[in-house]
Each structure stands twice: as structure tokens, then as C-alpha cells.
Amino acid sequence: MTYHPKSDFLRVMQERGYLADCTDMQALDEALSKGVVPAYIGYDATAASLHVGHLLNIMMLRWLQKTGHKPITLMGGGTTKVGDPSFRSEERPLLTPDRIDENIEGMRKVFARYLSYGEGATDALMLNNAEWLDQLNYLDFLRDIGRHFSVNRMLSFESVKSRLDREQSLSFLEFNYMILQAYDFLELFRRTGCRLQMGGSDQWGNIVNGIDLTRRVLEGEIFGLTSPLLTTSDGRKMGKSAGGAVWLNGEMLAPYDFWQFWRNTTDADVGRFLKLYTELPVEECDRLGALQGSEINAAKILLANEVTTLLHGRDAAEAAEATARAVFEEGGVGGALEVVELPAATLGEGLSVAHFLVAAGLVASGKEAKRLVAENGLRFNNEPVGDANTPVTAATVGEELKVSIGRKKHKLVRLS
């Protein structure tokens, strides 16, 4: 029988499709109904930006704050030095402390778009687990914390078991990650009264570890809640596109390309994505998702505008839509297209089309460029390019050259 939550937060989670599992739904619902509940999601600083795959959990934190509770974004300045082994086929490369700090700063910019930070009861709080993990005494930690963990149980977690079943090495360093993440929950409960950890369903084992540890050490009543691991209707993992990761930082992915990612949503995903990634009413999301034929394209544009507005602002969303209209409907250039600067010296007396595309970073290899041309997938200033060996000179580029790769990828190349 489906449980019907009383609290606004759990009701939103259930209605909009954010909820996969919860350790104790009724007890958490009671706690959320009685007062402010601090809740956190942890983010290891493995890249300079978060990507679209992180956005679902960020929206959960946003809804948590909108429904009167306190979101905590926990930066993994300490755990990133170890690396989360969950469902990975190999050990992560270790990052330097300076790189970790740079990555955290890049992530901070994204969170500031979705959450309101401050000193109030429901203002968001950003913490770094390096504050306590860097201070740990190893022997004390083994005695006080390590004794609460069963290696037998840890080996049974699917995230670890799948790695071992493939006979791939799991280092002692990575194995410790689970204990450190569990300790984070204990420390957050001690410092802030945090009572809820959220994350993707692949984090279930780590979350349960933290709950068990905190109950054993501090006898705290705390909870875990996970979201489904999201894939598109055609089976692709969220966060990736044909061109690579869909980054949330504007410096790493232009707002136009971010907008275009959402505009290209498969028809079957429109209603679901509207519920997960926008704040439109559920009934409106369902209505838009049920549209057919050409009408669904208007819903996709609305989806792209709403998601881009949350991240980059309304002006950026409107500029992206105007550019898309100019590019696709009017054959123009559009002011929001990403500009690629190519040193004039690189072009020299001229390069073949294939070498030009590689030099500008628009394709990964000459082989890919030749395949693109052979499949009639390349245009310069809206004109088809029929020969990968055609020379590209400074005169070809002029003030700027619009390069279209397929129907959906468009860049402006300028010489510098």
C-alpha cells in the first residue's frame, strides 16, 4: 500500500518522482512535520564542475529548502583524497589538495544558483569534510569508529561485491571510503543536528552505514532517502550527451549548449523531466508530457527555458532560444553560439577541413571528421562541405565561421 506523506517535502518527493527508498518513511515524515530538519548530500570534488547527472539531487535540496527545511551541501575535501569505489571498475586517480580546492570552488558557483546560503534556520550551509577528516588520529579512529563496522557486511554491499566479482582490485584506501562517509553523517549530526542524508540509490549502502554508526555512537534518530538512478527512455545515463559531459558551470559548457541539451529531450521523457528539473505544477507537467506531434516541441522549448533559467538566468535562456530559432528556423548565426578561438598561426597557409576541425577541437580525430563529411553532416555558414581535403584558409574563416556538425551542434570559429 502506498504511503501518503503529511509533510510537504516528502509529498513533493513522491509526487514528482524523486523518491526511490527511505529507511523509515513514517518516522521521517513525522520529523519533517514537527519542525526544521537539516539534511545533506555529499559531493566529492573530482571535477571542476558538477554535471547534469547531479542536478536531480540538487533539485531535491532546493525543494527541501522551499518546504521549510535546511539543506547542507557537504564538500568532500577529505573523502576526495580517497575516492568513492561505488560501482566503479577501477580505482580513481588521486587529486592534489590544490586541485580539490579548485574543484570545490567551481561547484560552489553552481550551488549558489539553486540554494540560498546564510545564517537563518532554513538557510543552506556548506561544509567541507576535510575540517574533521584531516584532524583524525588513525589509532583513535580505528578504536572508536572502526570497531562498529563488520567487514563481512561491507563486502556484501553490491557496490563492492560487483567489483570483486569481476576480480578487479579494491584497494584498502578505497575500502576505507565507506567508513569515512559514514563518519561524515555522525559528525554532521554532532555539529549541526543533521538528521537526513540523501543521495542516489547507488549510495544506499554508504547511507545505511552512516545511520548505523550514528545510532551506535550517539543514539541519534536519523534517516536516509535515495533517488532513482535516472536514465533516459532510450537507456542513456543522465549527465552525458554525444559530445561528452553536460557540465553545469557556464565556463565549461555554454548556456546555449546547455539549453540545447534539454531541447533535444526525447518525447517520452518530457513530462518526467519537467517534474524533476523544473518547478512547474505537477498537473501542468503531466499535460505537457502528454502532447503529441509538433506540439511536444513547444513543451521541449519550455523545458529547456525553465531548466536554463534556474541555472543561468532568464536572460541566458531567452538568448539561447533566440539563437536556436535563428540557427534552425531562419538559417542565421545567433548571438549565443559558443565561440571557438583558433590561433591564426595554427591555420597558417591553410589546413584541410579534417585538420581544421581537429585543430579547433570540434572533433576528436581526422577519421571522425572524414566520416562526418562523408555522411553529409558538416556545414560551413549553412553550406554543405563535400570534401574533407578542401583547404580552409583565413579567407574561409573571415571574421567568423559558423560550423554546423550534424543538425544540433553549432559553433562559431574566430581567428585570434
From Swiss-Prot:
Biological process terms in GO annotation: tyrosyl-tRNA aminoacylation
Residue ranges of domain S4 RNA-binding in the record: 351-416
Short sequence motif 'KMSKS' region: positions: 237-241
InterPro entries named among the record's database cross-references: aa-tRNA-synth_Ic (IPR002305), Rossmann-like_a/b/a_fold (IPR014729), S4_RNA-bd_sf (IPR036986), Tyr-tRNA-ligase (IPR002307), Tyr-tRNA-ligase_bac-type (IPR024088), Tyr-tRNA-ligase_bac_1 (IPR024107)
UniProt GO MF annotations: ATP binding; RNA binding; tyrosine-tRNA ligase activity
Record's keyword annotation contains DNA-binding: no
Record's keyword annotation contains Thylakoid: no
Enzymatic reactions: tRNA(Tyr) + L-tyrosine + ATP = L-tyrosyl-tRNA(Tyr) + AMP + diphosphate + H(+)
Primary localization class, coarse: cytoplasm
A Pfam family the protein falls into: tRNA-synt_1b
Location(s), subcellular: Cytoplasm
Protein name as catalogued: Tyrosine--tRNA ligase
Organism in which the protein naturally occurs: Cereibacter sphaeroides (strain ATCC 17023 / DSM 158 / JCM 6121 / CCUG 31486 / LMG 2827 / NBRC 12203 / NCIMB 8253 / ATH 2.4.1.)
Lineage of source species: Bacteria, Pseudomonadati, Pseudomonadota, Alphaproteobacteria, Rhodobacterales
